[in-house]
């Protein structure tokens, strides 16, 4: 986060793009593809596709069934299109962001935490006015066995829960903004990821503590049409959150969600 904030301060040009140190661009033409679309549609935020990889072998494209966003959709309708097609996800590096949005420090990343992209993407969604998406694979997202997304500790899960609480507080502080409703499915997905991670915490007392706090936000599951989240909602109604955690643990300790940035 500190490196990103430093880069934001040093950035020039009209748009800002992030790339994590262990990821890489798909090919040498990706910036041309981004630039061409930005010149055509002039959005505040352009989202793009990415490919998962272990560094050697491609593991599949993230958005497999959605083509590029049709040109001509009104700015006020663009975020609804993005959310209805499950294209708004918690990562900074699959987006090109108009640099003007970073003025006054409104889009600084919170430092010294994990999962910092979650609340940042929510704040970005509330701040930007127009959105676009291209189906081109721009980034190769590398998943290592030692990466944060492949390991679970109590502190990391607690930070994920704190991020969800932060997002809920942000939405509670927004008045008369229809985008709040559009962002509830986004929080629902983070909540589903939280449940999967809680199931992987080995210490039962720590798991119980996390689940006790997580119960306050279980109603967000009702806002998502994502198949995984709908299954969690059904399970929570049938066997409660504690039973849902047990089911996730049985299903390879929550691997249903491992690396699932969609």
Annotate each PLM feature:
Residues 1-11:
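Glycine-rich, basic loop-to-helix element that forms the pyrophosphate-binding segment
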Residues 184-196:
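Amphipathic alpha-helical repeat scaffolds of TPR domains
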Residues 16:
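Short aromatic/hydrophobic "clamp" motif used to bind/position activated sugar donors
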Residues 40, 200-262:
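Membrane-interface aromatic/basic loop that binds lipid-linked glycans or pyrophosphate carriers
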Residues 136-144, 150-178, 193-197, 201-221:
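Catalytic core of nucleotide-sugar-dependent glycosyltransferases
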Residues 177-185:
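All-alpha amphipathic helical-bundle segments outside canonical DNA-binding/catalytic cores
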Residues 3, 21-131, 141-155, 175:
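Donor-binding/catalytic cores of nucleotide-activated saccharide
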Residues 47, 133-134, 181-182:
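A structural signal for short, well-ordered beta-strand segments and their strand-loop junctions
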């Amino acid at each position: 986060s500190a490196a990103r904030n430093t880069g934001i301060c040093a950035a020039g040009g009209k748009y800002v793009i992030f790339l994590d140190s262990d990821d890489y661009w798909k090919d040498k033409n990706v910036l041309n593809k981004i630039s061409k679309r930005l010149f055509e549609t002039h959005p505040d935020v352009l989202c793009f596709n990415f490919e998962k990889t272990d560094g050697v072998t491609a593991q599949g494209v993230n958005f497999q069934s959605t083509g590029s966003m049709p040109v001509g959709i009104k700015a006020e309708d663009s975020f609804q299109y993005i959310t209805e097609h499950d294209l708004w996800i918690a990562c900074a590096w699959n987006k090109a962001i108009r640099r003007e949005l970073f003025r006054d420090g409104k889009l600084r990343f919170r430092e010294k935490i994990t999962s910092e992209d979650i609340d940042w993407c929510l704040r970005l969604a509330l701040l930007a006015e127009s959105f676009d998406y291209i189906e081109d694979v721009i980034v190769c997202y590398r998943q290592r066995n030692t990466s944060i997304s492949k390991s679970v500790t109590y502190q990391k899960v607690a930070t994920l829960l704190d991020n969800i609480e932060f997002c809920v507080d942000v939405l509670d502080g927004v008045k008369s903004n229809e985008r709040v409703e559009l962002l509830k499915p986004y929080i629902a997905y983070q909540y589903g990821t939280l449940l999967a991670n809680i199931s992987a915490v080995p210490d039962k007392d720590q798991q119980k503590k996390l689940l006790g706090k997580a119960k306050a936000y279980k109603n967000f599951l009702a806002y998502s049409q994502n198949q995984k989240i709908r299954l969690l909602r059904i399970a929570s109604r049938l066997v409660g959150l504690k039973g849902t955690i047990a089911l996730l643990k049985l299903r390879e300790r929550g691997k249903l969600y491992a690396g699932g940035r969609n």
